[in-house]
């Protein structure tokens, strides 16, 4: 049995750091665990220009303690009106690492998102030409589609045609939650990859709904049936370079979660590596953890691997019920790994 696990410094390829007071509260947790993070642009207003991206990067850097070596990677928020030249300029200037496709109204802060992918094909063609990755929240928003089916329907209606139309575009199918998504990514060409969150390794939809409404287990995409959780977990722990770490850590204050219309999002940053390690350990796949956490992501993005290492050790720690005004993932639970 492995009691200590040392891996190359990992990265988080999908995180919400928010802004203002919440940014100051949560950014240090991500920066302690990860060397780099792809930071989501769904602020109010969203990050759509290079100037806005540069300013947000500066605010993140100011929120991270000076003794932590952390690089925020900024993402452009795509809208129906996005200008391809602006996206290309931000990428060329080193401001934008990638661009994010939110289907309009799919999740928190997506009201300005894209109503039809056809509206941004010119932008996507330019991104293909310059090697800029597209990050996708892969759910349809049609009212006639059941919320548990939105990811699978998105693959059929939007993602499959997009991959065919733009075979050179790097695409990250973010926070996958279904067997269909895991299979699609596994079978897709090398330019298609996926991120996987810790919560979708550990919980199914019962966590939200059994014994009462559990708002702190509510995120988008929602957790699905158990067979989907098992398929996503098998993909994560498989060693395939197509799957890598993206926490989708998404903090909301308690009163925004525990409400008649509560917000979607799970704050997992404080114990993210421990949570992932627990899943890999349970599945006898610790040998594949470094690839998932530290290697597959940068290789897909074409970025250098991090120098240095982090060490996790087998130790029981109890996750606090609250961290400030936010309830963390695994609140009140004992987990079996600790970041040294």
UniProtKB/Swiss-Prot annotation:
Substrate binds at residues 16-18, 42, 137, 220, 252, 264. The active site is at residue 248. Signal peptide: none annotated. Zn(2+) 1 binds at residues 14, 16, 100, 248. The modification N6-carboxylysine is found at residue 100. One of its GO terms (biological process) is 'de novo' pyrimidine nucleobase biosynthetic process. Its cofactor is Zn(2+). Transmembrane segments: none annotated. It catalyses: (S)-dihydroorotate + H2O = N-carbamoyl-L-aspartate + H(+). Keywords: Hydrolase, Metal-binding, Pyrimidine biosynthesis, Zinc. GO terms for cellular component: cytosol. CDD domains: DHOase. Zn(2+) 2 binds at residues 100, 137, 175. Pathway: Pyrimidine metabolism; UMP biosynthesis via de novo pathway; (S)-dihydroorotate from bicarbonate: step 3/3. Its EC number is 3.5.2.3. Homodimer. Belongs to the metallo-dependent hydrolases superfamily. DHOase family. Class II DHOase subfamily. This is Dihydroorotase.
């Amino acid at each position: 049995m492995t009691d200590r696990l040392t891996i190359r410094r990992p990265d988080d390829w999908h995180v919400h750091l928010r802004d203002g007071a919440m940014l100051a509260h949560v950014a240090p947790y991500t920066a302690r665990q990860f060397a780099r993070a792809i930071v989501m642009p769904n602020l109010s207003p969203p990050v759509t220009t290079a100037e806005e991206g540069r300013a947000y990067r500066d605010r993140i850097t100011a929120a991270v303690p000076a003794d932590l070596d952390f690089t925020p990677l900024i993402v452009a928020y795509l809208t129906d009106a996005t200008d391809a030249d602006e996206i290309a300029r931000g990428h060329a200037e080193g401001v934008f690492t990638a661009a994010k496709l939110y289907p309009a109204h799919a999740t928190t802060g997506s009201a300005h998102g894209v109503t039809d992918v056809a509206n941004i094909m010119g932008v996507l063609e330019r991104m293909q030409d310059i090697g800029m990755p597209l990050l996708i929240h892969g759910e349809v928003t049609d009212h006639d589609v059941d919320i548990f089916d939105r990811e699978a329907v998105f693959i059929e209606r939007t993602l499959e045609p997009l991959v065919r139309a733009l075979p050179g575009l790097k695409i990250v199918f973010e926070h996958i939650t279904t067997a269909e998504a895991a299979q699609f990514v596994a079978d897709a060409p090398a330019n298609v990859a996926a991120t996987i969150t810790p919560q979708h390794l550990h919980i199914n939809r019962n966590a939200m709904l059994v014994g009462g409404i559990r708002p702190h287990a509510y995120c988008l995409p929602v957790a699905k049936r158990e067979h989907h959780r098992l398929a996503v977990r098998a993909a994560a722990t498989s060693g395939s370079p197509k799957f890598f770490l993206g926490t989708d850590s998404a903090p909301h204050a308690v009163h925004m979660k525990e409400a008649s219309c509560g917000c979607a999002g799970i704050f997992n940053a404080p114990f993210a590596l421990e949570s992932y390690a627990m899943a890999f350990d349970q599945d006898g796949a610790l040998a594949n953890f470094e690839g998932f956490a530290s290697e597959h992501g940068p290789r897909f993005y074409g970025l250098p691997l991090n120098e240095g290492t982090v060490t996790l050790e087998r130790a029981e720690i109890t996750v606090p019920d609250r961290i400030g005004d936010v309830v963390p993932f695994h609140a009140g639970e004992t987990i079996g790994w600790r970041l040294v």
